[in-house]
Amino acid sequence: MNEYSLTPVQEVDGLHIKRDDLYAPFGPGEVNGGKLRQCVMLVNSVKKDYKSLLTYCSIHSPQAPITAAVARANGMPCRIVYGGTTRESVAALPMPRLAMKYGASIVLAARSGRHSILQARAKELAAQENSFIVQYGINIIGYGDTLLTAVAAQTENLPDDIENLVMTCGSGITATGVMIGLHRYGKRVKRMHLVATAPDRRGFIHETLKKYGADREFEYHDLFHSPGFVYEKSAAATWGGIRLHPHYEAKTMQWFRGSGIAPESTLFWITGAEPRSPGQS
């Protein structure tokens, strides 16, 4: 399977599931899914102009190992910029450990892990070594066509008529790409449910959809601001034996199970699965 292959839609215990987690070019248990595909296509489009890759993110984000794996596949050095953490935490946590397994070096660049502070440090570091910066959610500014087209193409094999489409919304890039694809391939989705595990991206989503002539209504379910929600806290959920990502789809599945929406009328979009960390069986 390459980055242009369609991942399957499976019917599991009455629920249609888009299995984008099955895009796993580096093998079972490794980094996978739609965000990996976006990173692969992004780096393919820029690698001739840069010597190395660099990303900055939360120590819990799969963006670090995804970037590291793509860098290794292209023979490029990779640096991961973290803030507000320690060497001990980096050595113990699964995402930094996996990034290091793929050959990335870790830079503890700031006392704070705030996005704006890490972004400024990343720009300084990138300028020193002609590094391309892979940004939060995978770069949308300047590379929108590449990324959104990669996502939109995956809607081609969805059923033509869907009553409810349920998916996680973080940066909003995948959700936006899906809705562009629904428009492009004439898929009729009655209710689009975005379950948010990050700050509100509705403005960005509508603005981007308008540029592609694909703006539409969607229902926005805000988990991020709900009482007790913590991004870093894992959730556990499975469906028909499919183990869902503890930071993303597992939380969306917990919401779905309590929503009253019938599985038989729903397509559930899985963007990716949690990769195994080093030492994990």
Region locations from a protein language model:
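Phosphate-binding loop/pocket of nucleotide- and phosphate-handling active sites
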Residues: 257-281
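Positively charged, low-complexity intrinsically disordered leader regions
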Residues: 1-51
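Active-site-adjacent helical/loop segments in soluble small-molecule enzymes
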Residues: 123, 219-264
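A short, small-residue-rich loop immediately preceding and capping a beta-strand
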Residues: 49-68, 74-83, 164-171
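A glycine-rich helix N-cap at a beta->alpha junction
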Residues: 76-120, 213-214
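Glycine-rich phosphate/pyrophosphate-binding loop at beta-loop-alpha junctions
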Residues: 144-219, 274-281
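A glycine-rich, Thr/Ser-enriched phosphate-binding loop motif common to dinucleotide/cofactor-binding enzymes
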Residues: 27-39, 134-156
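Gly/Ser/Thr-rich loops at beta-strand to alpha-helix junctions
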Residues: 57-65, 87-88, 167-177, 248-252, ...
